[in-house]
Amino acid sequence: MSERKIPKEVIEEVERLREEIEYHNYRYYVLNDPVITDEEYDRLMRRLIELERMYPELVTPDSPTQRVGGKVLEGFKTVKHSVPMLSLDNTYNEEEILEFDRRVKKALQEAEVEYVAELKIDGVSIALRYENGRFVLGATRGDGIEGEDVSENVKTVRSIPLRLRKPVTIEVRGEIYMPVDEFKRLNDEREEEGLPPFANPRNAAAGTLRQLNTALVAARRLDSFIYYVVHPENYGLKTQWEALQFLKELGFKVNPHSRLCKNIQEVIDYWKEWKERKRELDYWVDGVVVKVNRFDFQRILGETSKAPRWAIAFKFPAEQARTRVLDVTIQVGRTGVLTPVAELEPVQLAGTIVKRASLHNFEYIREKDIRIGDYVFVEKAGGIIPQIVKSIPELRTGNEKEIKPPDKCPVCGGKVGKLNPDEVAIRCLNPHCPAKLKRALRTLVSREALDIEGLGEKLIDRLVDAGLIKDIADIFYLTPFDLAQLGPGIGQRTIAKILQEIEEAKKRPLHKLITGLGIPMVGQKTAKILAEHFKSLEAIADASYETLKDIPGIGPEIAKSIVEYFRNPKTREIIEKLKKAGVKLEEKVVKLDILRGLTFAVTGTLKNFTREEIIEFLEKLGAKVVNSVSRNTDYLIVGENPGSKYERAKMLKVKMMSEEEFLEFVRKRAELKGYNFDEIMRSWKEWS
């Protein structure tokens, strides 16, 4: 049978679509500066998927459609690195970094040496090879001589280009990491599913890259920074700083905070700056990598068998504290998982007072040998979540008590157990446990979802305990009489305010409602993708697995979770109740261009907006919002008690405005473009 002939125009369209999609991936994932809407991007991707299905002969390893995952691998091949991937020597103090500088200058016989200071990303080292500009290999560091071929998983990392912007043959190196928000989402999800959480973002990224199911890797949204060119002399590069600019030109994501330092004192100043500013970032950093800038100097300095002599890791101080376990309480999650929580003697840690720490599950307690009364070391996983890293048995008095799993649910008294023998978590098996409903309600009314401030934790507990709410939709059927039954502390004015907030919540954007439903694996970002794509909750509920998995940003694992959620008859019943109550189940899309083309950052506390609200407001008016101030920032909005962004904006001469000046600025621009400013302020929260 002869091969069928593919029309020339189809081949040309496929190639054009791939180039266009990769360009928009670069704008979105690398530059964080998209130039088309998500809907337009989806349209391009759907067309490419359609053509590749019709003509599977045209599918290539570097096609954007290969990023979504779906393959199940048998294992990972071992590959030898072309040049060893060495580790770095570490230092934690200024004296040792000054000694490093003295050694470098002595060996080079130079009075001063230029350095490049780069943030040390807490992720997984990766080597990437390209032939004629096309991705051919992604390998882990391994033992430095040999690593594992994780190419299929690397393809799911959207900031890593599958085609370079120049047709070069090259090997580069960098770090694959898990963003802070994704790490928190993943651990919350794992605890709800009864799985052990990851200890830190680095472990999460490493564990994800070694998954055999590429769809699962795609669902976890890893990211990357590239910082090293192997054999830079082949490309006419003379310094590390030139190499970073070259990597940007090729289309790689390069950390924007790297700095060229004229001497070691500028390196120390950079280290001090980021020691204080690191929490502004959406990824975890544990120090600064200091590199001699000139490659000819690097060659003179050479390396030992383990580490280069021309670079060093200048680590930030470890953020750990010692405290004591006073007691252990048990929380019941939305899916019934029982999570032990350590009640601690209050201790200062990473800028906050820590009184509680998750113990994750009873297997974790057994492995760490943690007991009530123990002295323990506590740290913040990924700089966010307090957790106990080890107990100190040497300080035991003999009065400590072992922590044993409960034999019944601490809330409803129902049976507890595991859904399957391999599960780590213990769950409440009672489908009517009020604790599950309470957690689901807290998710629904949270600020990220329907934002019903009057329905706080205590009031939700009282409503459920009184039998006034049986499922999450019952919130929208509450009456003044229901609330009055709750007794003292709920006056007429409070009742009216709560009911008004509930009424306003019915008009929230669809993505807020989707977030509030608590669908496993669906956070705020995925909720926005679903709302923009389907435009109604009922359309999402009716969507097939095949339709969902092909949507960029969804993929097979999330698609499976969504289908299973809406397959439940109870979910359908809740949707029907929401509809009858007048909750908005369709998206009202409003996009304005009042601030289009402008980049804003925000610092301090504002009077009229929370941090989440001001970001949402700016984006709805067409602005781009960034986490840190750079020369590309147009305006910094300054509230009360501003942070380090204020000083940086002054240094860079970035324009600053108060909240009042900002609103006046918006008013004038709105009027120039023919919009009613007062109407915008009244209704912007209802837009999508």
Curated annotation (Swiss-Prot):
Its EC number is 6.5.1.2. CDD domains: BRCT_DNA_ligase_like (cd17748), LIGANc (cd00114). Its cofactor is Mg(2+); Mn(2+). InterPro entries: BRCT_dom, BRCT_dom_sf, DisA/LigA_HHH, DNA_ligase, DNA_ligase_AS, DNA_ligase_CS, DNAligase_adenylation, DNAligase_N. It catalyses: NAD(+) + (deoxyribonucleotide)n-3'-hydroxyl + 5'-phospho-(deoxyribonucleotide)m = (deoxyribonucleotide)n+m + AMP + beta-nicotinamide D-nucleotide. The active site is at K120. NAD(+) binds at D38, E39, E40, Y41, D42, S87, L88, E118, R141, E175, K291, K315. It is an enzyme of class 6 (ligase). Zn(2+) binds at C409, C412, C428, C433. DNA ligase that catalyzes the formation of phosphodiester linkages between 5'-phosphoryl and 3'-hydroxyl groups in double-stranded DNA using NAD as a coenzyme and as the energy source for the reaction. It is essential for DNA replication and repair of damaged DNA. PANTHER family: CHROMOSOME TRANSMISSION FIDELITY FACTOR 18, DNA LIGASE. This is DNA ligase. It comes from Thermotoga maritima (strain ATCC 43589 / DSM 3109 / JCM 10099 / NBRC 100826 / MSB8).
